[in-house]
A protein has these predicted regions:
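Anion-binding alpha/beta catalytic cores of soluble intermediary-metabolism enzymes, centered on
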Residues: 2-64
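Glycine-rich, N-terminal phosphate-binding loop of Rossmann-like dinucleotide-binding domains
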Residues: 5, 117, 137-138
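Rossmann-fold NAD(P)-binding glycine/threonine-rich loop
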Residues: 12-38, 131, 135-191
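Glycine-rich phosphate/diphosphate-binding loop of Rossmann-like nucleotide-binding domains
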Residues: 35, 41-133, 142, 146-157
Length: 192
């Protein structure tokens, strides 16, 4: 089951989300499924977008062990789960948000940056240095009506070692992860 949000105002989102059985919660919307991300227990499924970020790192052979990672964004949809998944991969993680003091210098210290800020082009060249891997989760529409990420791709791409594009980056992998979760949920039901 995939619940599209926001729900109409007369519905209680928390009640509806938590009515889902974890085995059908393919995008980690219930509190119980989310607890699995934070405890390391296999309850339900992890959220698709943070898992997509981890799969991108795995696909390109980026070992997180001992690396400094910065997650820009602290939502329960991407930021916090991504941070926990990076910790599970033995990275040292800092979560940045709107109240982080001197965020560009914090980000420059990282080896890996996951950006889920929710604002177009918020991360520019002053946030990065050579050798970094940048995963841009953002999906925005710029003034020209084109899709763009939370990272100023044109300014950042020449500096860093690797960066995901928007469109065609994390979103595509997220869709693949979601399909995988749906298939796995069906297989679990059939084999139960």
């Amino acid at each position: 089951v995939l619940l599209f949000r926001p729900l109409p105002k007369h519905l209680d989102q928390a009640v509806i989300e938590n009515a889902l059985a974890p085995e059908k919660d393919v995008d980690c919307m219930t509190d119980l499924s989310m607890s699995g991300v934070f405890t390391g227990k296999k309850i339900g499924f992890p959220p698709c977008t943070p898992q997509a970020c981890m799969e991108i790192l795995d696909h390109y052979g980026i070992d997180c062990t001992g690396k400094k990672a910065v997650v820009i964004g602290r939502s329960l949809v991407v930021g916090k789960p991504a941070a926990m998944m990076l910790v599970k991969k033995n990275a040292t993680v800092t979560i940045c948000h709107t109240r982080t003091v001197n965020m560009p210098s914090v980000a420059r210290e990282a080896d890996i940056i996951i950006v889920a800020a929710g604002r177009a082009g918020v991360v520019g060249a002053e946030y990065v240095k050579e050798g970094q891997t940048i995963i841009d989760v953002g999906i925005n529409v710029n003034a020209e009506g084109k899709l763009c990420g939370d990272v100023d791709y044109a300014a950042v791409e020449p500096i860093v070692d690797a960066i995901t594009p928007v469109p065609g980056g994390v979103g595509s992998v997220t869709t693949s992860v979601l399909v995988g979760h749906v298939v796995e949920a069906a297989m679990r039901k059939v084999n139960a």
